[in-house]
Amino acid sequence: MRVTAAARSLLLTEFVSAFFLAMRYFFKPKPTINYPFEKNPISPRFRGEHALRRYPNGEERCIACKLCEAVCPAQAITIEAGPRRNDGTRRTVRYDIDMVKCIYCGLCQEACPVDAIVEGPNFEFATETREELYYDKAKLLANGDRWEREIAKSIELDAPYR
């Protein structure tokens, strides 16, 4: 027993086996990506930066039902509804989301009956101040306009699971 242990120690068998294992992985393609220049594909269910969507005719989708405000566990959404129109519909006067409070749970998106509020594919929205993370209606609509194609595609891919 002592002789085999001494032979292993003298011949450095563990070191040699570890070296060959390292060399095998050294020449394989790397599993990491060069992040700012390469990006992994994002799941259709990814929950990123919030956006308010519009109908194809340009009218905003939000009907001021306030379900998203009621269901938000972090109480990050504030909505003020405008007066009823002649056709009986309402629109929001104020729609604010405090992204510092938001926990990105997606309950607002699930509660919305007209798919007005969605969480888009953007995850790169770091800011220098906290005030920039307080999104108003104009910022949310701009996000919706910017990411509409990706958001519509994600909703279409996720439709069988809704």
From Swiss-Prot:
Its cofactor is [4Fe-4S] cluster. Gene3D superfamilies: 3.30.70.3270. It is found in: Cell inner membrane. GO terms for molecular function: 4 iron, 4 sulfur cluster binding; iron ion binding; NADH:ubiquinone reductase (non-electrogenic) activity; quinone binding. Its EC number is 7.1.1.-. It is a peripheral membrane protein. NDH-1 shuttles electrons from NADH, via FMN and iron-sulfur (Fe-S) centers, to quinones in the respiratory chain. The immediate electron acceptor for the enzyme in this species is believed to be ubiquinone. Couples the redox reaction to proton translocation (for every two electrons transferred, four hydrogen ions are translocated across the cytoplasmic membrane), and thus conserves the redox energy in a proton gradient. NCBIfam families: NuoI, PRK05888.1-4, PRK05888.1-5. This is NADH-quinone oxidoreductase subunit I 1. It comes from Rhodopseudomonas palustris (strain BisB18). The lineage of its organism: Bacteria, Pseudomonadati, Pseudomonadota, Alphaproteobacteria, Hyphomicrobiales.
